[in-house]
Design a protein with these regions (language model features):
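Extended, low-polarity transmembrane helix blocks
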Residues: 1-105, 136-207
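Membrane-interface interhelical connector segments
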Residues: 74-75, 107-132
Length: 207
């Protein structure tokens, strides 16, 4: 009940500020798993992806930078390479690649009418969704999104500007979904998952 929600919020805050980061990620994973199991009505792809990202975070050095935990560890600007880093990268790419395969099996995506059909469902549109519904650009959007999904393996195969541009394009697509469709946390979680693919020069500029 209320206690479980409070504990979940506390774990989320700890993760955001980077206090006992790995432990906070693991605790949050367990608590969200419990909450989602108790309420299947809120279950969606976003929650599924969020839980898996949290589980990977429990094995990643997420407290090494931009976290309270960073105060207690020696400064280290080296690369973090492990089975966990490989796992989280593969996890995200698999989501996109499987999505691409499923869409290629359907006629609507190949024809370019899938996105137009989605925006005709009033219960799904939100915000700017009603403004873009029915516009011819949605057909272009169908082909463009399918092309991005097909190219998703380049997230791990490509480097430098190519990878950065692909991350930006996929993130832009998700933000467009967030502004126009009622998809829960899926678009935002997807954007967060893409951040792990940004190359070091991007993060150096951020700092």
């Amino acid at each position: 009940g209320t206690f479980l929600f409070g504990l979940t919020a506390l774990a989320a805050v700890a993760l955001v500020v980077g206090y006992r980061s790995r432990l906070a990620a693991l605790v949050l994973f367990v608590l969200l798993l419990s909450l989602h199991a108790r309420n299947l009505l809120i279950a969606n792809a976003g929650n599924w992806l969020l839980r898996r990202l949290l589980l990977w975070c429990a094995f990643l050095p997420i407290g090494r930078r931009w976290a309270l935990d960073a105060r207690h560890v020696a400064a280290d600007r080296g690369r973090a390479v492990s089975i966990a880093t490989l796992g989280v990268l593969v996890q995200v790419v698999v989501v996109y690649a499987v999505n691409a395969v499923l869409k290629l099996r359907g006629d609507r995506w190949v024809e370019g009418s899938a996105v137009q059909y989605i925006y005709q469902v009033d219960s799904l549109t939100v915000g700017l969704g009603d403004l873009v519904a029915g516009t011819p650009l949605l057909s272009v959007g169908s082909h463009a999104w399918l092309a991005l999904l097909v190219c998703s393996p380049l997230l791990v195969l490509a480097r430098g500007h190519v990878r950065t541009l692909l991350v930006a394009a996929l993130a832009g697509g998700h933000l467009f979904m967030f502004a126009t469709l009622r998809l829960g946390v899926f678009p935002l979680v997807s954007v967060a998952s893409l951040l792990v693919f940004l190359p070091p020069p991007v993060w150096d500029r951020v700092e």
